């Protein structure tokens, strides 16, 4: 299944979650497109709820179905709770960490920064958004990319970096200190529904 490339605003409203991370999509019309008000949502079946939760998380990270399922399967082979492991693996992706550090205003921008070679890990350029970070690894912006407006503006307005990361805004240098805890990740996602979806 190909990565979704349609309107993120419509998709955000349909799923009831801000895919951009800004929340602007839901400010004026916090209901699905094509509906006439917030009370028009159809009651979903158990399968429908599971599917919607899976789509919410997949679109949030901008992944193809194959990438998403592969990561889910890897999480299932790890010790611990499958759903929590899955969420932690997703949050440990390079593009997710670039976004969480505040180097990009949206996850899509973060993915583009990585794709276009603007990001380095431990001093070497990495252009794979799905690159899985390990504790202690250092994320920096390439020297020739440090004056990009998209990066400077993002860092300027960002006022929060999660505790599992460390960020030196002056040098555009971040450290993946440790794996995040579930409580530090999106609370609006019920990953157990995703586990149930793939366990059908």
From Swiss-Prot:
Transmembrane segments: none annotated. It holds the Pfam family S4. SUPFAM superfamilies: Alpha-L RNA-binding motif (SSF55174). CDD domains: S4. InterPro entries: Ribosomal_uS4, Ribosomal_uS4_bac-type, Ribosomal_uS4_CS, Ribosomal_uS4_N, S4_RNA-bd, S4_RNA-bd_sf. The keyword RNA-binding applies. The keyword Transit peptide does not apply. One of its GO terms (biological process) is translation. Residues 92-155 form the S4 RNA-binding domain. GO terms for molecular function: rRNA binding; structural constituent of ribosome. GO terms for cellular component: small ribosomal subunit. Keywords: Ribonucleoprotein, Ribosomal protein, RNA-binding, rRNA-binding. PROSITE patterns: RIBOSOMAL_S4, S4. Belongs to the universal ribosomal protein uS4 family. NCBIfam families: PRK05327.1, rpsD_bact. Part of the 30S ribosomal subunit. Contacts protein S5. The interaction surface between S4 and S5 is involved in control of translational fidelity. One of the primary rRNA binding proteins, it binds directly to 16S rRNA where it nucleates assembly of the body of the 30S subunit. With S5 and S12 plays an important role in translational accuracy. This is Small ribosomal subunit protein uS4. It comes from Staphylococcus epidermidis (strain ATCC 35984 / DSM 28319 / BCRC 17069 / CCUG 31568 / BM 3577 / RP62A). The lineage of its organism: Bacteria, Bacillati, Bacillota, Bacilli, Bacillales. The gene is rpsD.
């Amino acid at each position: 299944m190909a990565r979704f490339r349609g309107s993120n605003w419509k998709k955000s409203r349909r799923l009831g979650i801000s895919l951009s991370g800004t929340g602007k999509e839901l400010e004026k019309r916090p209901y699905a497109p094509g509906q006439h008000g917030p009370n028009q949502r159809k009651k979903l079946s158990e399968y429908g709820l599971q599917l919607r939760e899976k789509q919410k998380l997949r679109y949030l990270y901008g992944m193809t179905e194959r990438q998403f399922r592969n990561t889910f399967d890897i999480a299932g082979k790890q010790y611990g709770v499958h759903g929590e492991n899955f969420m932690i693996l997703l949050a440990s992706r390079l593009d997710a960490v670039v976004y969480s550090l505040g180097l990009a205003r949206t996850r899509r921008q973060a993915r583009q920064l990585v794709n276009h070679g603007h990001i380095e890990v431990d001093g070497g350029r990495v252009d794979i958004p799905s690159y899985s970070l390990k504790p202690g690894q250092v994320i920096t912006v390439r020297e020739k990319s440090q004056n990009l407006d998209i990066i400077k503006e993002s860092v300027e307005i960002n006022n929060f970096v999660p505790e599992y990361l460390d960020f030196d805004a002056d040098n555009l240098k971040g450290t993946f200190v440790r794996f995040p805890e579930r409580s530090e990740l999106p609370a609006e996602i019920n990953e157990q529904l995703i586990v149930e979806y793939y366990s059908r």
